Amino acid sequence: MTIFICIFFIPQNSNIKVINYLETGELLWPAPGYFGINSYFGKRHAPTSGASTFHKGIDIAAPQGSEYIAVANGTISFIGFLGGGGYTVTLTDENKENGEIKYSYCHSDPNIIVSVGQKVVKGQVIGKVGPKNVYGVQGNRYFDSKGNPTNGATTGPHLHFGMRINGEYVNPLNYLKNKGKIE
């Protein structure tokens, strides 16, 4: 019999406290049933004109209309078209002992099913993955190769999931329960 012992060292950043989610895996996977990741957190080649070369979240492969859920209990703090993020829903975590924690769900369906100020519970459906193309958005500067306006900096439907602790973007895979794998 072979026994493996793993020791993990978590680098401490003076601006970020390590939250209990890291140890307990309390945050739910945001896109139930969809575990493929098209783009990871960190440096990358920009997939489309106007997209950042530093990816501030993860892109989960999910078809248009797929539901996404609240990863934690909290309050919807923003809904709107957010440049490269397209239609975005932001959830502010109710857990305040570790500072302010926000989760962004980008490239959402424009027919948002929650409202700003609404309290939601972990696991509650709060939106759907949106279409690649959206029309009638004033100030949208993102277009596909055919000149059609897109839902932010995107090449197709997917859920971009981002996480900020005290305003600093962090890799969501360090905190999510499934880490993109079916258990």
What are these regions (language model features)?
Residues M1-T2:
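Cationic-aromatic interfacial patches
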Residues Q118, G139-E183:
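Acidic, glycine-rich catalytic/binding loops that coordinate metals and/or anionic ligands
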Residues A61, T92-E94, R164:
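A generic structural motif
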Residues T53, A70-I112, V116, N133-N151, ...:
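Zn2+-dependent peptidoglycan hydrolase active-site motif and core
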Residues I112-V120, Q124, G167:
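Acidic, glycine-anchored pre-beta loop/turn
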Residues I5-Y87, K96-G99, K122, K132:
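Surface-exposed, glycine-biased beta-strand/turn segments
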